[in-house]
Amino acid sequence: MSCFSITGAIKNYAWGSRDYIKSLLSIESHGPLAEYWLGTHFLGEAKTEDGILLSEKIGHRLSFLFKVLAISTPLAIQCHPSKSQAQEGYLKESLLSLDDEERNYPDDSEKTEVVIALSDFTALYGFLPLEGIKENLSSFVPELFGKIKDSSSIKEVLETISNLSTEESRKILSQLEEKTGNTPPLSFTLGPKELCALCLSLYSDDIWCISPLLMNVVNLKANESLFIKPGIVHAYCRGNCLELMSSSDNMTRLGLTKRHVDEREFLKIAYLDSTPSLFLEAMETEEGAFSYSYKEAPFSLIRYEKGIHTLPRIKDGIIFSIEGKAILKKEDEEIEVGKGEAYYVGEDDKMMIEAQGSIFFAYGDCL
């Protein structure tokens, strides 16, 4: 059976949760744990039980990166590049080291993402129609509305905000705080007002605290999903999720972060038009599994909850248990996968999985 245990790479960013990944992986930690990477990206590669890098074990790199995210405070307003944008940006930054904090492009790959909620989950996704933006700004920050009321595009609005003086920004943020407060909301269902208050509680001098007035607020329940194409502006705000993406760590940030921000590059690659949320509905298979796939994504994901299923025949895949256990079977061989455990699955015929819980199978190309 071409299948073996792997351990992912943990990222301890400040926005992470102090309990979710710790509990999922049954590990000790005294600080926030934000992400758990399962893949072969050089900035955080999975390893086998004996410490060998996954790419060395299998002789190539995966076409996808599979992550767990545990979010206690909002991530940066961000977007990811297309293939051509990534290649151009990577070349432009060639004099910087690959782990330099100033880099937007640590690799030359496009970045498409699918996010699957594991709990109640809130995100900002794409821009509202221009009239919706103007209506929100008129209600919450008349000072800013007066400056953008004649704008004919979302790009004009963003450029106006980007060019505000420090004093102008201070007045607008003060007006926003009067309307929304700056206390983190206790409710898990968040709207624009609550998200502005949350952002102000963390980044009180960042003009992009107004972002929830410009963007779609999306609240997902567990197992609901969003598809994020290159260029789509987004920010995850609160909750736990799985993220399946092209094997890339490229991003440009607009604000709401202490990490590197590049407004000029962001406005260059972002899709600056209104964007309806692309919900990705899981399709139930004949065997009772749930498939997440999108024709523009170079990867797929299946959720198994119970029963016995035939795994698709693939080049590379990763099985990961969020809850419960699974048994991988081939002829007389069996491997048990417990909560928080991950297994690499290579090219193999007629492998079966018996699931009891919430088991996810991420994979790239089918054979």
Language-model regions: role of each:
Residues 1-187, 258-277, 301:
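Transition-metal
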Residues 46-62, 126-127, 202-221, 312-314, ...:
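A short beta-strand-loop-beta hairpin characteristic of the jelly-roll/cupin
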Residues 73, 325-367:
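Generic C-terminus detector
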Residues 75, 113-123, 239-259, 299, ...:
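A short hydrophobic beta-strand segment most commonly corresponding to one strand
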Residues 167-213:
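Active-site cores enriched in adjacent His and Asp/Glu residues with nearby glycine-rich loops
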Residues 215-228, 232-237, 242, 331-350:
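Short acidic-glycine-tyrosine-enriched beta hairpin
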Residues 240-292:
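C-terminal, non-catalytic macromolecule-binding modules
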Residues 300-314:
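Conserved short histidine dyad/triad with adjacent acidic residue
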